[in-house]
Amino acid sequence: MDLKGKFRYIFFDADDTLWENERYFRAAEAKFIDLLADYTTPEGVQDMLWRKQEDNIPLFGYGSKTYMIGMADAALELCGGTLPEHIYYGIKKIITDLAFHELEIIEGVKETLQALQGHYELIVATKGDLPEQMGKFRISGLAQYFHHCEVMENKDEKNYLELAAKHNLAPEQILMIGNSVKSDIAPVVNIGGIAINTPHEVVWVHEMMDMPESDRIIIVQNIREVLDYLL
């Protein structure tokens, strides 16, 4: 599929597309499982944490704050309604480490953005906690390549239609690049846009979804390969 010159804007996902994210949450999850090892099996801790995350996302949205609340809720239930002091401080340490980890840019991202800059208007289209996502965007060193950063409440068809309207685009004029089939690929092609999938080896369970069949989806093995379609 030749996309050269067919789009004015390119929208990029952020977490696990531009920089590493999920691997840090997996590391936090492993520490949490160890912390609660005396209360149930590793599978029991993991299942409880996942269920509490799913319960809290509709209330608090996406991001490490929701993850922190989910950990506290899971620990409280697993501990029988009373949170021991060492569990409380253990959770606090896990969340602190998660919140202040070094931001690691994914290999090939900077070179790809440098090549595209000047040919397209590049926009980050991510979801999550606004201050958290904007903070990562600012310290990433990538802001110089982007027109601006959109932090969306969610990433479904409705949100992408709103994004298109905001930029005076028809839905079929959206070109989205991202790692998540559920958030970056399926909703975009469902409204008529084009999506380029840059798979990541670590996928959040909440984002797992089979790839839809569509001739408007391109799958690349690393982000540098998008240049073959765009320049």
Residue spans for each PLM region:
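Asp-based, Mg2+/Mn2+-dependent phosphohydrolase catalytic module
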Residues: 1-7, 110, 114, 129-130, ...
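An amphipathic alpha-helix signature
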Residues: 25-33, 68, 72, 130
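Short helix-capping segments at alpha-helix termini
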Residues: 38-42, 80-82, 141-144, 168
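Substrate-recognition element of Asp-dependent hydrolases with the DxDx(T/V) motif
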Residues: 86-104, 109-140, 149-152
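A metal-dependent, Asp-based hydrolase signature
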Residues: 47, 52-97
